[in-house]
Amino acid sequence: MKIKQAIDKIPGGLMLVPLFLGALCNTFTPGAGKYLGSFSNGLITGTIPILAVWFFCMGASIEFKATGTMLRKSGVLVVTKIATAWVVALIAGTFLPGDGIQNGMLAGISVLALVAAMDMTNGGLYAALMNQYGSKEEAGAFVLMSLESGPLMTMVILGASGIATFEPQLFVGAVLPFLIGFALGNLDPDLRKLFGNSVQTLIPFFAFALGNTINLSVILQTGFAGIFLGLLVIVVTGIPLILADKFIGGGNGTAGVAASSSAGAAVATPLLIANMAPEFAPVAQQATALVATSVIVTSVLVPIITALWAKRFSPKHA
């Protein structure tokens, strides 16, 4: 059976299919983990430890070697994406209630959902698009984008906007596995290869555990809001990214469009933030479902928009 091949045809499938399977388990057999115990319970409830290993391996996979063009391009895109999410947090924090929108078609939208969906770029999608529609240097910009992985940037944004307060040690704890992996991977290429190969392998495991924190009814309730969030990510982050790429990064805007997506890893952010700041616990489940939908929407639409933009503004693709 070509199971992996079928999963790869679904945008973000490696993350979203196990996530959905986990949500199925949690909806119809919510006590399965405690009932089975042992290793099965670890797989079902082990989101945080599995993600900790994943962040370590992600750090180890990054090679600290880049040209000036790569650093300028990636730096511009990363800073612009984070700054945009921060502005959105400031505005949303002023107008949205702490527990998010509770009624109507946009029920579930919260500051946590908005920031988690917007502050992290799908680096793999970006690299693939820029390999096709840009240069090797532009494609290589995804290296710095990997630094967005994990809850750290979301913590910084929520803290800087005055929406949440985190103890200093929590920032250290959030980034330490990544930094240790990064250091080891750059000290020894063999370790980088060893741990880097595990990044993709671990995604279905933490996605399944994450899915076991979601009830399918929440996914159904937030369907339209999730689609709306995905479109919002493309428009709200895409416009500043295009302008930054053109006027600061020296590009034609294609890289900006390619970076206007939600990262698959962002699906785990609401739960991680709620684990550190309990005031977000009431909105974490809905935010997770919304961000998951946003990942699908942006994974489908961003390649199409990038191709159209490159055809219009890039001479070699005209």
Curated annotation (Swiss-Prot):
Job of this protein: Catalyzes the proton-dependent uptake of 2-keto-3-deoxygluconate (KDG) into the cell.
Species whose genome carries this gene: Pectobacterium carotovorum subsp. carotovorum (Erwinia carotovora subsp. carotovora)
Entry GO CC: plasma membrane
Record localization: Cell inner membrane
Family: Belongs to the KdgT transporter family.
Pfam families: KdgT
Protein name stated in the entry: 2-keto-3-deoxygluconate permease
Entry keywords, A to Z: Cell inner membrane, Cell membrane, Membrane, Sugar transport, Symport, Transmembrane, Transmembrane helix, Transport
Catalytic activity: 2-dehydro-3-deoxy-D-gluconate(in) + H(+)(in) = 2-dehydro-3-deoxy-D-gluconate(out) + H(+)(out)
Disulphide bonds in the chain: none
